[in-house]
């Protein structure tokens, strides 16, 4: 089956979505119950379910995140095939300073799941780009704004700030009065990146 809409240049040949209802956030009890089902499907001992959230939410060990992402995507029952977002939250007083948060969506089941990975300031987290290609620029943004390194990322470099920018602007200890304007000297130091993929 091929579908071409006025919004797409390339025909879509995949299966039609099985659930065409709009996403409606569920109650806490339903989210917790669904989280129990997902946790049983995954069976990772280092995964902790966070209850009382607006969607099924889990804290995952950084060493298991790639396996959890793969299982959520490849499971025929769960089918979390779309990464909606990846972002970080900075807790400077905590030993594991950053929460790196993944939000995934299942077109098949019309539901969302949230995964949190806690990492320290000098720790790296494995990249998820081998599972979801769409995580590429999300990971670059988290690296640029917070300094979280994604091991194995195919092109981990700044995406929102220039190469001469020092620091990471969304960290809570970043001085907002500090400005890193791009000067002619900085421009001379920057190596232009010509990426044939774009």
Walk through the language-model features, giving the residues of each.
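Terminal low-complexity/charged segments
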Residues: 1-198
């Amino acid at each position: 089956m091929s579908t071409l809409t006025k919004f797409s240049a390339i025909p879509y040949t995949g299966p039609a979505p099985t659930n065409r209802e709009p996403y409606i956030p569920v109650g806490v009890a339903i989210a917790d119950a669904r989280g129990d089902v997902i946790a049983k499907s995954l069976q990772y001992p280092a995964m902790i379910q966070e209850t009382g959230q607006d969607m099924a939410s889990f804290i995952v060990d950084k060493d298991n995140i790639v396996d959890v992402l793969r299982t959520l995507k490849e499971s025929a029952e769960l089918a979390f095939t779309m990464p909606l977002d990846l972002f970080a939250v900075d807790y400077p007083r905590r030993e594991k300073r950053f929460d790196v948060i993944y939000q995934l969506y299942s077109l098949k089941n019309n539901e969302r799941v949230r995964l949190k990975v806690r990492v320290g300031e000098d720790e790296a987290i494995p990249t998820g780009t081998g599972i979801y290609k769409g995580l590429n620029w999300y990971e670059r943004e988290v690296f640029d704004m917070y300094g979280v390194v994604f091991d194995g990322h195919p092109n981990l470099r700044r995406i929102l700030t220039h190469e001469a920018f020092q620091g990471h602007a969304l960290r809570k200890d970043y001085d907002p009065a500090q400005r890193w304007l791009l000067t002619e000297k900085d421009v001379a130091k920057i190596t232009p990146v010509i990426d044939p993929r774009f």
